[in-house]
Structures are given as C-alpha cells and as structure tokens.
C-alpha cells in the first residue's frame, strides 16, 4: 500500500527517474528497468516487476505509485477515430483523440484543462483556463491510448517495435497551449522519444503553438521536435483579433522565431495552420498576403475548415473558396493541404475539442452529453 504522499512515477522522465532511484540508494540501471516496466509493459504494480530486486520493490511499494488519469468515456467514430474523455480531477476533463490512417496512427494529446490564449475561432478558449496538466497526465494519455489500442488488436504489451506500435505519431494539439505548460510538456515529450519508453522519433512528435516566442526558442535549444504554428491570419491587425497573443508577439517576431527554430528542427519546414473563416481571412488577397508574410520561412500550409460553435459568431468558408485560396498558395509552389474532417460524429473533429463551453471543462455535463472538443490534427 502506498502512502498518501507517494510520488507518481509517471511524472519522471529518464533523468528524473534516475535521480529518484538514486535517492533510494539504487543504481541508474534500475531506473531503466523501471521505466521499461511502466512504459513498455504497462505494469501497474511493483510485485510484477520480476527483474527488480525484492528490496527495491518493497521500497517502491512504500514510497511510490503509478497513477493514471481516469477515463470518463470512450467513443469510436464510424471512420475509426477514437476519443477518450479523461477525468483530471476537481470536475475538470480533457480529451485525447486517436486518428487511424493506412500508414500511421496519430494521437492528439492535451496539455491543459482549458486554455488562456482565447483564440476567437477556438471553442476551448471560450471555456476559460482551469489548470496545467502534470507530466503524468500528459504522458498518461499516450500510455492509456497505446495499450488500449493494442488490447483491442490483441497485441500484448512489450518493447515498442515498429510492428507492434499502434500510435506512430503524437501531436501536442489537443486542449491548451503546450508552451504555456513547458515544464510538464517537455518531460512528457522526452518519454515519447525515449527508446526505453515509446521510442518515437523527433519527426513524429509535433508540438503546435499559437506563437509563444520565448518558449519556442527554449524548445529549440532543449528538445527540438517538429513544429506547427497556429497562424490563421496574414497580417497583425487581423491576427490581433483572432489570436490575441499576437499583440505580445506580432508576426515579424513570430516569423523570426520560426527561422531560428528551423536551424535545429528535425524537419526542414514549419507547418502553418490556418483556420478558414468565411469573409474573415479567406480571400485570394489574404492568400497572397500570407505568402508575403511567410516568404522567408520554409513551410507548408494546412488549411482547416472551421467547425462552428455558437459563441464564435463565425462560419466556415465555402468549399469553393477554400479551393481558390489553396490554389493561390499551390501556384506559388508551397505545399498546401486541406484538413479532412475526422470523427465529427463523436465531436472529435477539428475545432471541437473544447469541453462544455459555457462552464469550462466541467465533467458532469460532458459525460452525459456529446462533448465539444480544439483542433484534432494529423500532420
């Protein structure tokens, strides 16, 4: 039985686990063994960790725990998209979405309960900010999804060889702004990349930011993964209105940060995400302006048809207008994709990762009715 003050081992990346084992008088190799049991074999209790010394198992039982967030609901869409509602306590909930494709499986992970950035087109921002998630709550989403998906396919836990892995890509694009929860997000991403945990490459872990420039620089220095930037407007006046963070870090500053990031990034381009809003940011003139503002940043564009919600006062661009907008970008030689809507029958489509919009991320309302979820993205 663990004590009420026991540490949750899911909060530790490799370095943290080595330090913790050291505090118990154990050598670093014990931390690697422990990490494999937790993240590759999905072990939930210490007695089953048979290659650990009994003395260490007894120490762990008295001082540590492996505590996962609770699953409040689990839904599968007609197109195979799977959405979990995760109870993170005190009435708050976040959502995790798995998007299966022929050659990969992408997991969209949340980093905060609610969001303080308050983008006009994003329903998550309308519910307000509740709190940051812990490292355990972030990596717990991947651990939960990977082993639930393996179980559904009849695959046993074990080392994450390519043939066994179900989640091949992770996108930090669920609820919240990950760079405003840097100290919990980075250890979680280190575990995603660790060969003694999930073994994903840096090219297969993508962090999406609305443009927190100082933290983009820090991420580039400490853990450069693939980067997506929520752009959504081609000039400062419009972006100030759609993405209020732009008032603090305007486009010129953001583009310079993107250039710096590319010097260390695992991919040779930035993905710019652009939510298509009818009559707001979707004209061909906007597209030409977008090309001008991003001209010095190697990039691709991901155009996202807006998923309306009542509080926004916005509507989705017409399909023919999205095509015209995209064609301007394509004709300029820039790779451009239009997001395919996935999981909309379970409210897991792009723009719907939100929670009960009028009452933050309150759990009770969301377990009894369809949840409104932010951007579910497969890059």
Curated annotation (Swiss-Prot):
One of its GO terms (cellular component) is cytoplasm. Transmembrane segments: none annotated. Binds 1 [4Fe-4S] cluster. The cluster is coordinated with 3 cysteines and an exchangeable S-adenosyl-L-methionine. One of its GO terms (biological process) is tRNA methylation. The active site is at 95 (proton acceptor), 350 (s-methylcysteine intermediate). It is found in: Cytoplasm. Its main location: cytoplasm. NCBIfam families: rRNA_mod_RlmN. [4Fe-4S] cluster binds at residues 115, 119, 122. Its EC number is 2.1.1.192. Its cofactor is [4Fe-4S] cluster. One of its GO terms (molecular function) is rRNA (adenine(2503)-C2-)-methyltransferase activity. The keyword Repeat does not apply. Belongs to the radical SAM superfamily. RlmN family. Specifically methylates position 2 of adenine 2503 in 23S rRNA and position 2 of adenine 37 in tRNAs. m2A2503 modification seems to play a crucial role in the proofreading step occurring at the peptidyl transferase center and thus would serve to optimize ribosomal fidelity. It catalyses: adenosine(2503) in 23S rRNA + 2 reduced [2Fe-2S]-[ferredoxin] + 2 S-adenosyl-L-methionine = 2-methyladenosine(2503) in 23S rRNA + 5'-deoxyadenosine + L-methionine + 2 oxidized [2Fe-2S]-[ferredoxin] + S-adenosyl-L-homocysteine; adenosine(37) in tRNA + 2 reduced [2Fe-2S]-[ferredoxin] + 2 S-adenosyl-L-methionine = 2-methyladenosine(37) in tRNA + 5'-deoxyadenosine + L-methionine + 2 oxidized [2Fe-2S]-[ferredoxin] + S-adenosyl-L-homocysteine. Keywords: 4Fe-4S, Cytoplasm, Disulfide bond, Iron, Iron-sulfur, Metal-binding, Methyltransferase, rRNA processing, S-adenosyl-L-methionine, Transferase, tRNA processing. This is Dual-specificity RNA methyltransferase RlmN. The gene is rlmN. Disulfide bonds join 108-350. Residues 101-345 form the Radical SAM core domain. S-adenosyl-L-methionine binds at residues 176-177, 208, 230-232, 307. It holds the Pfam family RlmN_N. It comes from Burkholderia ambifaria (strain MC40-6).
